Amino acid sequence: MYDIILFGDMPDRNTYSRASGSHRIGTELREHGYSVLVVDFSNYINIDKFSEIIDLAVGENTLGVGFSTTWFPFLLPDGSASNREPSKPAMRFNKAAENLSESLPVDFAGPHVEDYFDKVRSVNPKTKVILGGAKAFMYINLPGIDNVFIGHAETMVVEYFDSLSGKTSNRIWNKIIDHDKKAQRPSWDFRKSNISYEDESFILPSETLLLEVGRGCRFNCKFCSFPLIGQKNIGDYLKFEECLYNELMENWNRFGTWKYTIVDDTFNDSTEKLEMVKRVVDRLPFKPAFWCYLRLDIIVNNREHIQLAKDIGIREV
């Protein structure tokens, strides 16, 4: 049985792409000695399948079952929910998407959400039910939730489970945990971080995985609500070159992965970043393909970005 089980959704029912947040948190927790099962593709999990997984994975040692809300439906101010969002093409133009049933994400925005929490507690009443992800703030008031993590949670989840497991002194936790929502404690350094997938994730060579090169953006745009903007020193928010190389090589050697979506807020926010990624790509024994967010207006004033993007392997923006 696992210490912690994390459920992650997918951007779109037709893409079969995994969200990366649950795997980033899972990697961090494993590095601190916890056994973690990450379950992907929640769009294809209903309450019956969820119950099967819980029966197989939850035991007396299980500290928590968590859910990533990033690709869950939007909860609207009037209490209703919407699945029709631009990030989910299969649902964007499908009016029937509002009535999709029998899936974990849709049930989370409906009247049957407590069935999932009740199932967890029927196996182990002491197991905590937690939420994280980009839409966690929308789901704070769900009945049956023990704790909600807001923001980048690497440091907070480790402190939380260290307290629950007895590794550190017991703490009284607020329902909303956001004391280090930018993950900036001195004890942790994003630049050394990676995502390491387990064999039980069954990564296929044809998959497109998600990749962080940097966390944050050097610009401070008025319209942007992302938390880590306005960073002037690129050395503070870019992964170390060797760390990025090792992550790409691990996925290539273990799974044959060569396609990635780069999830940086603005991939071309500096020439230095592109040059660093090109150095990494030049060392690889394979030719990767990347998708990313680029600002075209920056390219106009930095024409060298065109050739750098081509050399790196940017296929689509």
Name these PLM-found stretches.
Residues 4-5, 11, 162-213:
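N-terminal [4Fe-4S]-dependent radical SAM core
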Residues 3, 63-66, 259-261, 316:
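Structural motif
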Residues 4, 35-37, 127-129, 260, ...:
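Hydrophobic anchor at the start of a short beta-strand
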Residues 186-317:
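Radical SAM [4Fe-4S] cluster-binding motif and immediate context
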Residues 3-13, 65, 70:
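Nucleotide-activated donor-dependent transferases that construct or modify glycoconjugates
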Residues 8, 39-43, 228:
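Residue-level recognition of beta-strand->loop/alpha-helix junctions
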Residues 25, 53, 112-120, 244-247, ...:
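A general structural detector for well-ordered alpha-helical segments in enzyme core domains, enriched
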Residues 21, 28, 37-185:
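Glycine-rich beta-alpha loop elements in corrinoid/cobalamin-binding modules
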